Amino acid sequence: MVKKEAVRTDSTEDNSVDNVQARSNFIAATKDELAKVVWPSRQQLISESVAVILMVILVSTVIYFVDQIFGWITKQPFLFG
């Protein structure tokens, strides 16, 4: 089989222009998308943050107590053995 010889062109100038255009398009699209975002009010942000923190505390407390119970259960056979 005959391989085609690759044609090399000096297109670094074209690539740099394309990169600048691509970055410009990306930034413009990002600004458009951020303009569509509905940002929460301060009150909503605070109340939802408090809810998340309370749920983290609750779940971590439950996991702690379940761990303590299983730790106690696993030590029982060795206490009477």
Swiss-Prot record:
GO BP, sorted A to Z: intracellular protein transmembrane transport; protein secretion; protein targeting; protein transport by the Sec complex
Membrane topology: Single-pass membrane protein
Disulphide-bridged cysteine pairs: none
Compartment(s): Cell inner membrane; Cellular thylakoid membrane
Example of a GO cellular component annotation carried by this entry: plasma membrane-derived thylakoid membrane
Keyword Plastid set for record: no
Gene Ontology terms, MF aspect: protein transmembrane transporter activity
One Pfam family it belongs to: SecE
Keywords: Cell inner membrane, Cell membrane, Membrane, Protein transport, Thylakoid, Translocation, Transmembrane, Transmembrane helix, Transport
Known function: Essential subunit of the Sec protein translocation channel SecYEG. Clamps together the 2 halves of SecY. May contact the channel plug during translocation.
Record protein name field: Protein translocase subunit SecE
Species annotation: Synechocystis sp. (strain ATCC 27184 / PCC 6803 / Kazusa)
